[in-house]
Every structure is written in C-alpha cells, then in structure tokens.
Amino acid sequence: MSKLLPWEQVAVTPLSVDSLDRWAEKALARGATMLVLRLEVPLSMDELWRWAQRWEGVRWLWHSRSGPGFYGHGKHFTASDTPPTHRPHPSYLFGRSCHNLLELEEATTWADYAWLGHFYQTASHPLQAPLPLSTLEEAVKRFPNFPIIAIGGFTSPDRIEKARALGARGFASIQYFLA
C-alpha cells in the first residue's frame, strides 16, 4: 500500500526564502499536496518547531540538504546520500532523488518513492542536459508499482500533463509553486 496520494504535487523550497510561511501559503494555494524543506541555511530547532506547529495537518518532508535528523512526515535524500538504516515510524516517508535508471532501481529497495529527472532545463541545474521524457516512460514500465515523481522544469500545465500521461505519480517543482 503506497504512502502517497494517487497524484502528488510536491512543492520544494528554493535554497533560501524570505518567509517560509508565505512560501507555504503560496504553494498550497497553487495545489501542493506535499511540501519539501530544502534550505541552504537550515532553521533552528525552535524555528522549525514553531513553523511545524503553525502548519499542523500539512504533509511536509525534510530534505537531507537541510541537515541531519528526521523531521516532519518524511525525509528526502539526494542520490549520493547513504540510505537510512532505520525508520523513526512505519508511516514516515523516505524518498530519493534519482538521475538515471540505475539510481532509481537502487531506490526501489528502500525508498517509498523517488524523484526522477530533470526533464526540462532548470535554473538549479543550468549546465546539465535534461533527460529525455522517454526515460520517465521507461522507468514507469520497469517499476510499475513504485511511485515515481517527475522533477525538473515542470513549470506549466502542459508539461505536468505530459508527466501524468507517461505514468508519473506526480511532479515536484520549485518554480511552479512560486508563480
């Protein structure tokens, strides 16, 4: 049984935000079903606790780039992170960023979902060539029971619909939720 919704719209913070509350409000207004805190300068434990209390009932994940620890409803790991050795609670989500099918295959052994991409040019990866959308299609066929969330340049409804049509279980974006 998947811990994810049938279709996820994942809002990822930019590396820095002026107001995490305003960002969350905007992301939720644009339809985000999950928030991922990926901050260059992590919040203090006190700030994080107060923010989490204000946003009780909203699913949010802690990105490994924001620091160690297990906070929120889950943790998202980079492709180069070591897989976790324990899960704080059975309902706690683990996700992983993947940039190819080999990384994705490894993620299926321990993660609850994976981000796969990037599929379009992005400001966060300006020097890296995007993956062809056929990679997403192949990934969904190879791992039909594993939730794959497309990431990278999903800034418009037509791009999002392409990901859905190819079988992605959702999309993750920074820019889409800032518009």
Protein language model annotation of sequence segments:
Residues 78, 116-117:
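Flexible, Lys/Arg-rich cytosolic regulatory linkers and terminal tails that connect or flank
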Residues 1-75, 82, 87-113, 144-146, ...:
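Conserved N-terminal beta1-alpha1 strand-loop-helix module at the mouth
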Residues 137-138, 161:
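Active-site phosphate/pyrophosphate- and oxyanion-stabilizing loops and adjacent acidic/basic residues
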Residues 120-126:
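A short acidic, helix-capping loop that chelates divalent metal ions and anchors anionic groups
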Residues 128-137:
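Charged helix-capping and loop-helix junction motifs
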Residues 170:
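Active-site hotspot residues in diverse enzymes, especially metal/ion-binding acidic/histidine motifs
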Residues 119-120, 176:
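Flexible glycine-rich beta->alpha loop in the catalytic core of nucleotide-sugar glycosyltransferases
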